[in-house]
């Protein structure tokens, strides 16, 4: 999750936070957060340094910090509102969970050769120019470190993903409720493969995971993994 001077994530997750304050027992990569692969695809995280890029309220990061024995999980998000929710919900998990308020590009640019694993669940990879973000992510990973992320396989209205690295303007709300837009990158499989290769990654894999629901605004998920070149 990324933001500009106006926090366009101010409202996101607030209702859930009012009634669900527990560390999640599950971790899903799917758009509807129900089924599909789980944290096992991250590999053994014991003693590893992990980062969640665009962590929102840090629910996925809290799950990993609690159940998978990493040395540290950094939950990084630029939104003041999401940062505040994450601190409120999971601040007690420090120091294993480190909640960081920062733009993701700015953060990873200061963390060269730090992370064993970086991941994003419909987070910063969706809302940041990949040609700017992904080279910085590669530098923040240790040689051989892994990037894993889930992203939309198509637009929520059903339109196909983009063949080029171009964003679309999608609906958003300002903190006072006014309608606005933000940029989101919804790219085809081969487009992600190309931009990852150009950004310093190898062993690139892109899998399309079908939606497990027929609810309105459901979507298939692209699950992408890549390794930083040594």
Predicted segments, located by residue:
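A short glycine-rich, Lys/Arg-flanked "PGG" loop and its adjoining helix->strand segment in the class I
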Residues: 131-146
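A short SAM/SAH-binding and catalytic strip from SAM-dependent methyltransferases
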Residues: 117-131
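Short alpha-helix
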Residues: 183-200
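A short acidic, Gly/Pro-enriched loop at the edge of an enzyme's catalytic core
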Residues: 109-118
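Conserved class I S-adenosyl-L-methionine
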Residues: 1-46, 59-63, 146-175
């Amino acid at each position: 999750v990324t933001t500009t001077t106006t926090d366009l994530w101010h409202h996101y997750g607030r209702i859930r936070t009012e009634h669900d304050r527990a560390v999640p027992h599950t971790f899903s990569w799917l758009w509807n957060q129900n089924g599909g692969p789980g944290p096992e695809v991250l590999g053994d995280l014991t003693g590893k340094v992990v980062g969640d890029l665009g962590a929102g309220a840090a629910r996925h990061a809290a799950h990993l910090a609690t159940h998978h024995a990493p040395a540290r999980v950094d939950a990084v998000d630029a939104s003041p509102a999401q940062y505040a929710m994450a601190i409120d919900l999971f601040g007690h998990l420090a120091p294993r969970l480190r909640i960081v308020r920062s733009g993701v590009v700015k953060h990873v640019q200061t963390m060269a050769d730090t992370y064993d694993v970086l991941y994003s669940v419909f987070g910063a990879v969706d809302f940041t120019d990949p040609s700017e973000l992904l080279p910085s992510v590669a530098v923040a990973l240790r040689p051989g470190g892994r990037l894993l992320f889930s992203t939309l396989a198509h637009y929520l209205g059903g339109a196909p993903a983009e063949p080029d690295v171009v964003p679309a303007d999608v609906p958003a709300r300002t903190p006072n409720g006014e309608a606005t837009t933000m940029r989101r990158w919804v790219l085809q499989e081969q487009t992600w493969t190309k931009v990852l290769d150009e950004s310093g990654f190898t062993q690139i894999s892109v899998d399309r995971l079908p939606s497990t629901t027929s609810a309105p605004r459901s979507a298939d998920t692209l699950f992408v993994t890549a390794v930083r070149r040594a």
